[in-house]
Amino acid sequence: MSDIMTPIPFDRLMNRILVEHQQGAVFGMQKCYQAKNLQPNTLFGRKLEGQIGPAAGPNTQLAQNIVASYYGGARFFELKTVQKMDGRELAACVAKPCITAEDECYNCEWSTELEVPQAFAEYVKGWFACKVMAKEYDLGDPDAFQFNISVGYDLEGIKLPKVDRFINEMKDAKDTEIFKECKAWLLANLDRFQKVTKEDVEAIQSEIINSVTVSTLHGCPPSEIEAIASYLIQEKHLHTFVKCNPTLLGYETARAILDEMGYDYIAFTDFHFKDDLQYSDAVPMLKRLQELAKSLNLAFGVKITNTFPVDVKNNELPSQEMYMSGKSLFALSMSVAKMLTRDFNGSLRISFSGGADYFNIERIVEAGIWPVTMATTLLKTGGYLRFIQMAELLEKNLAKPWEKVELSLVEKMIADAKSDKHLVKPVKPLPNRKSDKKVPLVDCYTMPCRDRCPIHQDITSYGRLVNEGKFQEALEVILDKNPLPFMTGNICTHTCQSACTRNHYETDVQIRTNKLIAARGGYDAVLPGLKQEGSVQKKVGVIGAGPAGISAAFFLARAGVEVHVYDKDAVAGGVVANVIPGFRIPAEEIQKDVNLAKQYGAQFHLGQEVSDIDAFRKENNFDAVVVAIGAHKEAPLVLEKGEAYNALHFLADFKAQDGKVNLGKNVVVVGAGNTAMDVARAAKRNAGVENVYLVYRRTKRYMPADQEELEEAIEEGVNFQELLAPFTHENSKLLCHRMVLSDVDASGRRSVKESDEVVEIPCDTVIASIGEKVDGSFYEKNGIAVTDKGLPVLKKESNETSVAGVYAAGDGAFGASVIVKAIADAKLACEAILNKTIGTDRPSQTTDEKIYGKKGNLVEPEKGLNPDKRCLACDHICENCCDVCPNRANFAIKVPGVEMHQIIHVDYMCNECGNCETFCPYDSAPYKEKFTLFHRAEEMEDSTNDGFAFVDNDGNAIVRVGGEKMNYKVGDKNTKLFYRLAELVDTVYNDYSYLLI
């Protein structure tokens, strides 16, 4: 495929807007912002009914980007930068993909990739389209939005004829061909409008802009910056912003801010800080420009800030340097604003861009900093729809005139940013949220949470029922696949939440909370009604009453099998009941999970240890045996002197002795997994303990514990000692070698090297939490084949061991893991025993309107045990790739007779930025892998995408699938083309012909 975009002619642009709006959307946006009965503000002598809009960048390059922004609520548009290098010459210099915005954003793009005259035409088309949309769709005052041009990068280039002409024609476009064309089309097609009149069209002003933002390259001398701004003020009579760089802060300050906020991994040197404009030169220059503009009755200010150049270290983008933006830039940008506000006493106008979004936009504007433009937040799921929420939020202060920038408010924002979870980097690296599957050509909607769950729970279904207050029904849905709703509702590691699409908004849906609400709210009603599904003439013994054993008992007993569960402990529940502290999960709720299995008829024989499987099986006439013995073999911590207390032994003692274990005052926990966090938190609660230290050979970022577990330990006062490796415990001290981080290893973690430095930590008791192993001797004694790690050799499809009829599940089968994995193991074994599939997939049963109503809205979950209603029901509508495409090149269509929307890629609108690849839940890049509509058949030659192009107006098309081309006629029932793909081609031709330009 080619990265050269084809602009949409104005007649086709307007036709699409009008026809698609009748279908309920505009450029894929199913809702809009309407500025009703608002008193607008003023900026540069013109009305402005909103202080926000898209920044110069991927969201202001094409007419459709501008239209989508306006429809969403943008009212100030900083158009993509124009400079002397343009078109194919510039595109050849931009490495693709050029954007990655999963968390903070990085890009390696520059100015417009269009030719300058094309860019001008796009801006004029966008201008006209927004004007008539405002009137036709009641979006607001047609004269209350503003365009602002961005030009660069040197005075010589700005004075070149093509850029000079661009500036002049943006100032007054009435004599240009594109302006005349747009106006003529509107006048000739007034019959297609309900509200737009001839007078409205005639009133569209040709003075598109009266302001400019100066953009210069890094290293541009202050004299050149001043010369450019002076020229635009004096010669072009434009209100002017000069874009400033975060490098004004100085290297040490910028490095310290980023390190403090968790961005210590972002690499950069002091080169740009020395090479860029220096603050000591900036202030006098800006004061001179401010006075110059004032003398000509023009406004002057700064644009804070440009993106921040950093090094490519982990193949983030195919370039050597990339430009950082988004949340990691906020504190840097606002710190520049603070310095300038202080030194100008608030009189210097600031246009802001640098990590603005819904969570901070109100405070930014209240501080007197506006207009505010943005890019990163628009590149995430929800896309342009995110403008709606922000525009509504700002309505109440819209009319407040600008007086000055309030220094105290700016300082408060900076201070708060250092601990704002929306701005700081999480302690742990982001999990991989992508599936290992490739995106299919059709039916690609998917539910990442269910896909990631080992038992594929119907999360959206029970979540919906919980929010409807139908707890009994919700629990019934859960129990279909999950026999341990209380255990998983309390302490599941919820990998489902890590994959949740809402992570790209703010915080994952609290799936585990919804489950616990259903369990607690539905248990009493559900329990008496649990009846066996039938009678299966089988008898099965289960060894072990932990999560895997209870799960096996539940599944088998429900099916009608006679099940007997044996365990050496007096209390069923395994490690969960006998080891995990009570502050993690109430004991009575563990037993409720046991009761569910008992209600189906499972019989528990506690305090009875089984050592001989063959005898056990014969004595009880068991048709099958499920071994679920857990992983309890210690992984000892070897010290030169002293001994360590085993983590599981301590937790069991802590529970049995009611938190009164003799530990002394100072406790050191060695390890960094979830169990280590439990140990540390339990030790903090233990009688007599004053200090708890957690020692690990790497840093918090590389600790295996889940983010949630880590944060809870930090909040409870556990003292984390990073980069330490213990070697001796004596005289109430633990001696550790200081470790030094080295390069990233194959696991994705940075390797460590031991230094000569020795660190002493006060220590009365050392508790080792460095993992548990499976005791392979149990299997060997029973004639079961094991691996070199002591794990049983199992059949992948059934978890059956080398002994026929004997199955293994849980930690004892695969090593220490999590509860939901134990359930999955047990389920697989039970399916083999029963010879049937357990559980039924249930759709979310929601509506398009409900889902689209949530898209674009950033909302944190309620605190406490409250239902989380923010689910986007991705099994019904995903469309992430459509949301995040700035150019709207991924599009959802409704195929007649097909329930779910289908996604096609539109080649002529794509510049291969790669943003959709980041947010697609599959291990795929939609712009390369979805069925693609090409502008012309010859453009298929520049691409390897499967797709189609129409060759005439009669429905004849060329289609390529799997590299093979064929001719296809719309409606042909005898075609060899797969019917689902034929439906896509037919639907585009019949119902979405506005996509054909």
Model feature map: region roles:
Residues R75-M85, P246, R363-M390:
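Glycine-rich phosphate-binding active-site loops on the catalytic face of alpha/beta enzymes
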Residues A518-G534, K592-I613, E634-N686, T787-S798, ...:
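Glycine-rich dinucleotide-binding loop and its adjacent helix/turn
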